[in-house]
């Protein structure tokens, strides 16, 4: 399976015959690379956006102290790696520079002066460009397999080329990012996507992560649902350590028998996300965890759903809208606690008598008797249908 990101380690492998040597930061070889940049002074380092491999000849640097400052500035700008030309302006790399790159897991390479550094940059740029092309092809093909599954010509052969064999088993998981976070920080989801893909490239190569609108969609190959859950839990923990987890809703679909069926797994994962978003539940849930919702999602006619809601809890919704009351919320909480006034009061931080009054009022508005089990069940289903609209 081809990765969606190119790492500094892969780039290094492609130019080992150019007399380039890694002298520090070996643990950072898994870092993703976006592009290359010549950086000869600390001022230029401030223009870095993160993810670059920087190249320096040392021109303009008069001592080791200035070199250390330059390296620190490059690393603070979140570059993925540093290549330094030694021989003419920089005679050698001192211990302080090496130690700092090891501490920050920033790969530091040296190239002798007789080596044409421009050729290394050219190879890097070609590899990065090729990877971007492959990433776009994979992302587009996965999107087509999900949303235009009947058009196999739009995705089957393309995914095969990139290592996604059609008869392998696949499972889709969805990270749905809060739209408010998207509007206020578009770069957030980009950083999150990069962080996840970087993690997968190191720890789990049987999965890719692509972005479609405000969702990050994971495609796992030959991976059970329980294993997917375990991997996602580790990814969330990793992203939390990078302060990249905000309001994210996560769902896992069922494993499919073919790439042709990943649209089903996506639909299931997306259904879980809808429920999690409605309940503001940030836990990772599988499709099999949502119980009766699986049956309710199978109802295709939205008009039937709306009619049922209107006939059961519609009057409470309308009453709350006109009177700025909260009977809808209180009634649902009451049903979730199997009709316990005290548990409902504890959950909502209100007095038991207040709950009793509001439940009686709800019965009056709906013209029902909530002491009857079938009535409570019917209203509970209406609430669940309300969740999926």
Predicted features, each with a name:
Residues 54-55, 79-88, 105-113:
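Short hydrophobic alpha-helical runs that function as membrane-insertion/retention elements
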Residues 72, 98-99:
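Alpha-helical segments flanking ligand/cofactor-binding loops in enzyme cores
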Residues 147-389:
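Cytosolic nucleotide-utilizing catalytic cores of signal-transduction proteins
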Residues 103-146:
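Long, charge-dense
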Residues 1-75:
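Gly/Thr-rich phosphate-binding loop signature of adenosyl cofactor/nucleotide-binding cores
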Residues 56-59, 86-87, 176-178, 222-223:
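Structural motif
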Residues 92-97:
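Short, glycine/polar-rich helix-capping loops at beta-to-alpha or helix-loop-helix junctions
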